[in-house]
Amino acid sequence: MPVKGFKPYSPGRRQMTVSTFEEITKTTPERSLLAPLKSKAGRNNQGKLTVRHQGGGHKRKYRLIDFKRNKDSVPAKVASIEYDPNRSANIALLHYLDGHKAYILAPNGLQVGQMVVSGPDADIKVGNALPIKNIPVGTLLHNIEMKPGKGAQLVRSAGGSAQLMAKEGKYATLRLPSGEMRMVHIDCRATIGQVGNLEHENINIGKAGRSRWLGIRPTVRGAVMNPNDHPHGGGEGRNPIGRNPVTPWGKPALGAKTRKKKHPSNRFIVKRRGKK
């Protein structure tokens, strides 16, 4: 969706950009596919803070998205393209010919009235979902499973696409948006095409309050805290850190690697992602 700016009639409007929502065809969601979504504000089931800088924001309902795409050989008509406040991509409402309704991630180029289908015999067409073993090498994919039948976990955000690079034995090699080359089982399902809403990356928040609408709270630097609040804090005026950068709890930060050296999925990674 194209992005529009504003005349600078206030400091907050000067840099702000918003989506024009031209692709959105329906503004009220399908009630049968909504679920309540309680605000966690970064707390776990014990009420303890586990993720900082979260809280507040507009109240939301969760849209139940079909990430498995396992309703085989039943064609579905795209009834509408809708906004989803819980993700960067838009979603498409499908009406299956047997009366079932479902939401899927809206791929780039998907139009209202278009027919999509899932299953091993599906055509290589945008919006269709099928096992990777039935997809030709070089195809752009999104909504990719990591384990057969578990549901899609990879390449789900706006504008994302992976390319099928090779198929050998039981595994296929994908090039992910990060540049990582990764193997997945050929029985895993993927959807043809690129995730829509390509211009999402060009949106400028513009002002602090808009971040608060999204449930994002301020990030305070440790250097401006008191020494009892952060290892970087204290001192008269501005000071260098004076030690290796650390988190509020004293663990290495700012470039320290956090991935486990013996992560179970290491054997599926052919090439690590490059530095940005």
Swiss-Prot record:
Stretch list, region Disordered: 225-276
Coiled coil: none
One GO molecular-function entry: structural constituent of ribosome
GO BP: cytoplasmic translation
Stored NCBIfam families: rplB_bact
Function, as annotated: One of the primary rRNA binding proteins. Required for association of the 30S and 50S subunits to form the 70S ribosome, for tRNA binding and peptide bond formation. It has been suggested to have peptidyltransferase activity; this is somewhat controversial. Makes several contacts with the 16S rRNA in the 70S ribosome.
HAMAP family: Ribosomal_uL2_B
Name recorded for this polypeptide: Large ribosomal subunit protein uL2
Organism, as annotated: Desulfitobacterium hafniense (strain Y51)
